[in-house]
């Protein structure tokens, strides 16, 4: 009975890293979408005084600056996540069995 428990435990161990990786990726996507929403709201509140038919030069410059900072920040975050992903081998447990 113990051998069947240990073999099913090792089978689950082989699936867990894949599932964990999938969950991490989906969580990162969700966080990124939340960040886009927050930055859109922040830039709108910061830069848009009165909605009108045309942006004035101050509002336009503000939006450009806000979006550029968002892109810089997003690129930094993506690079950091990529470094984190590379430093964690996904299938290391299944290869050692």
Curated annotation (Swiss-Prot):
Tissue specificity statement from the Swiss-Prot or TrEMBL entry: Present at high level in liver and brain, and at lower level in muscle and heart. In CNS sections, it is predominantly present in the soma and the dendritic portion of the Purkinje cells of the cerebellum, but not in the glial cells. Scattered expression also is also detected in the brain stem, olfactory bulb, substantia nigra, hippocampus and striatum (at protein level). Ubiquitously expressed.
Judging by the UniProt lineage, the source's domain of life is: Eukaryota
| Keyword Ubl conjugation assigned | no
Q: Fetch the Gene3D superfamilies from UniProt.
A: Mitochondrial import inner membrane translocase subunit tim13 like domains (1.10.287.810)
What GO terms in the biological process aspect are recorded for it?
A: protein targeting to mitochondrion; protein transport
| Gene Ontology MF terms | zinc ion binding
Q: How does it sit in the membrane?
A: Peripheral membrane protein
Where, per UniProt, does this protein localize?
Answer: Mitochondrion inner membrane
For this protein, the record's InterPro entries field holds: Tim10-like (IPR004217), Tim10-like_dom_sf (IPR035427)
Modification Phosphoserine, positions: 57, 87, 94, 96
Disulfide pairs? 43-66, 47-62
Task: Alphabetically list the UniProt keywords.
Answer: Chaperone, Disulfide bond, Membrane, Metal-binding, Mitochondrion, Mitochondrion inner membrane, Phosphoprotein, Protein transport, Translocation, Transport, Zinc
Motif Twin CX3C motif boundaries: 43-66
Example of a GO cellular component annotation carried by this entry: mitochondrial inner membrane
- Tell whether Zinc-finger is among the UniProt keywords: no
Note what the entry says on domains: The twin CX3C motif contains 4 conserved Cys residues that form 2 disulfide bonds in the mitochondrial intermembrane space. However, during the transit of TIMM8A from cytoplasm into mitochondrion, the Cys residues probably coordinate zinc, thereby preventing folding and allowing its transfer across mitochondrial outer membrane.
Its quaternary organisation is: Heterohexamer; composed of 3 copies of TIMM8A and 3 copies of TIMM13, named soluble 70 kDa complex. Associates with the TIM22 complex, whose core is composed of TIMM22.
The UniProt family comment states: Belongs to the small Tim family.
Q: What is the annotated role of this protein in its UniProt record? A: Mitochondrial intermembrane chaperone that participates in the import and insertion of some multi-pass transmembrane proteins into the mitochondrial inner membrane. Also required for the transfer of beta-barrel precursors from the TOM complex to the sorting and assembly machinery (SAM complex) of the outer membrane. Acts as a chaperone-like protein that protects the hydrophobic precursors from aggregation and guide them through the mitochondrial intermembrane space.
The name of this protein is Mitochondrial import inner membrane translocase subunit Tim8 A
- Which species does this protein come from? Mus musculus
Gene that this polypeptide is encoded by:
Timm8a1
């Amino acid at each position: 009975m113990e051998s069947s428990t240990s073999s099913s435990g090792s089978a689950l161990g082989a699936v867990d890293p894949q599932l964990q990786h999938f969950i991490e990726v989906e969580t990162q996507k969700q966080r990124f979408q939340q960040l886009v929403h927050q930055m859109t709201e922040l830039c709108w509140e910061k830069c848009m005084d009165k909605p009108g038919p045309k942006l004035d030069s101050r509002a336009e410059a503000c939006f450009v600056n806000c979006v550029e900072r968002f892109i810089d920040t997003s690129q930094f975050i993506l690079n950091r996540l990529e470094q984190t992903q590379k430093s964690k081998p996904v299938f290391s447990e299944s290869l050692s069995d």
